[in-house]
UniProtKB/Swiss-Prot annotation:
Keywords: Chaperone, Membrane, Mitochondrion, Transmembrane, Transmembrane helix. The gene is timmdc1. It is a multi-pass membrane protein. This is Complex I assembly factor TIMMDC1, mitochondrial. Chaperone protein involved in the assembly of the mitochondrial NADH:ubiquinone oxidoreductase complex (complex I). Participates in constructing the membrane arm of complex I. It is found in: Mitochondrion membrane. Belongs to the Tim17/Tim22/Tim23 family. Associates with the intermediate 315 kDa subcomplex of incompletely assembled complex I. One of its GO terms (cellular component) is mitochondrial membrane.
Amino acid sequence: MCTAVRQDLSLKCGGTDVKQPGDSQPGHLRALLGFTLPSVYASDSSTQILPKHIGKPEFPDTGWDRIKDLFYNVEGQYTEELRNVVKSGIASAIVGMIYGGLPGARHARQRFIQCSQAEIYRNRVDAVRAAHNAAIRGFLRFGWRWSWRVAAFVTLFNTVNTGLTVYRDQNALSHFAVSGAVTGGVFRLNLGLRGLLSGTIIGVILGFPAGVLILGLQNLGGETMRDKRRRERRELHELRVTEWNARLKVTDDLIGEMSSLKHQDSEIDLQQVEELLSQPRNGNAAKGPYNQ
């Protein structure tokens, strides 16, 4: 039960005091700070601030925007450039494993046979099995050494080349040269400054023929990777613009419907008020108790 108390202008509801806007501030806080604080009430607070406008989707025309598009896809899938980098890394790892493993297995088998001339086996099957086991160990040992090195080299090369191509939005042989220089320098960095310079020079020399080969294969396909990516990006931008226009149209239609409904409601309310005012007054209700 709520009771109004005029002395302190407070509303007491079940033992809880609810201060009115005209109440004074707490004495403890005023005594602590030494000055009065401005009062803020719920009725004075503004509604949630909404954005003034919904920005129109912009075409990613800068290098960093295109770089960010490599790692962001509306469909939640990886872009084709990243998939190509991963595929090339896996393929180079397999090639490196085969390239280093086969000679390593042959060398390990021959060395095992040479070192096991004085060893006695129970039968020929045990001797052949031991030689095969040595060849397998050699294949895995030497194949792994070549596999991760070739995979790292190719992955770093393709990563730098893809980054430069996407950032500048064009295919150029200089990108392959720079990629080869960076990759060769990194792989020869443990040899010091001379190794860094020699690796950079070798990378530049090998980057040009690799670029000519890759660009030639892409041109034979009728469409380069950059042209395909540019076309897909343009189509995606047009799709976003179309979706944005559709949402904007729906918003305008909704605002128009709300305005029309509000106008109709106000007219109905005004008509009801006019009808009430036009009705005759009740004579019995107009007479007071003292007029009887």
